[in-house]
């Protein structure tokens, strides 16, 4: 049995009760933190909280050579852990399909997603979001300006009046994920002000909404023009950015109240 368990958004307590029970019942637990990570905890704290040893896998050990995970699941109850919800990433869907091809029974225990939290914290209605996109670090996509994948997604959503959730790039070495070292060489998180600065070059007058540390005790939500957000400071990671489309009157009220949106942004 291979059980995919979403750990939620922030720390060792963000997991659901169902996920906690499944993890504690597993014979063996694997995790990966390169697609996303829990900035409010460490692997050591997760292990202590759940009284379960956790083996952290490198990217190659999940995407290219998952044999150890699959072989273990053929004979034992294995838990595979990720931040957020495990089935948001194509990598994890692929791992599940590989397991099923080998006759391994699979199960999914969902966790809270960043998209659900962004909608809840901002008051932007979930069904009014279009396709999401990821904004990489400038050095990561090897070209000047914004990647076409980002601009095309935002443009298509805006044409339809839909909001765009922009995931911001992270680079986390497994050593940092385990120790939460804070070493700049081991972990790097794009901030919302940096992302707003990138987007301002193409969308100088567009509004934006920052969501920082969703799932933590002290989340930050702020709405303004992207050029204004580019000069802001929103505290520690993880950050998300939303580029709103057309706003329902309840969404306008929510942004004014929950995100301190200036009146001129909502006209």
Q: Which functions belong to the PLM regions below?
A:
Residues 2-5, 116-267:
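Beta-strand/loop-alpha-helix module characteristic of Rossmann-like adenine-cofactor folds
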């Amino acid at each position: 049995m291979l059980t995919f368990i979403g750990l939620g958004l922030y720390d060792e307590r963000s997991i659901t009760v169902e996920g906690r029970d499944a993890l504690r019942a597993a014979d063996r637990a694997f995790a990966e933190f390169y697609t996303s990570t829990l900035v409010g905890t460490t692997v050591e704290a997760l292990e202590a909280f759940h009284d379960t040893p956790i083996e952290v896998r490198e990217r190659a050990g999940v995407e290219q050579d998952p044999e150890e995970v699959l072989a273990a699941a053929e004979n034992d109850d294995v838990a595979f852990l990720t931040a957020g919800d495990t089935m948001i990433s194509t990598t994890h869907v692929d791992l599940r399909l590989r397991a099923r091809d080998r006759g391994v029974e699979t199960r999914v225990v969902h966790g809270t997603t960043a998209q659900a939290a962004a909608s809840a914290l901002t008051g932007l209605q979930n069904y009014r979001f279009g396709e999401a996109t990821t904004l990489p670090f400038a050095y990561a996509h090897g070209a000047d300006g914004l990647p076409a994948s980002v601009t095309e997604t935002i443009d298509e959503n805006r044409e339809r009046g839909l909001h765009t959730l922009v995931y911001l790039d992270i680079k986390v070495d497994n050593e940092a994920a385990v120790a939460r070292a804070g070493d700049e060489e081991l972990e790097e998180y794009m901030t919302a002000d940096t992302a707003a600065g990138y987007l301002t070059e193409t969308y100088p007058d567009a509004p934006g909404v920052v969501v920082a540390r969703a799932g933590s005790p002290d989340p930050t939500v702020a709405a303004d023009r992207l050029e204004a957000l580019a000069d802001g400071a929103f505290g520690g990671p993880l950050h998300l950015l939303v580029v709103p489309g057309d706003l329902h009157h309840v969404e306008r009220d929510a942004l004014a109240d929950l995100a301190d949106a200036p009146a001129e942004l909502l006209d």
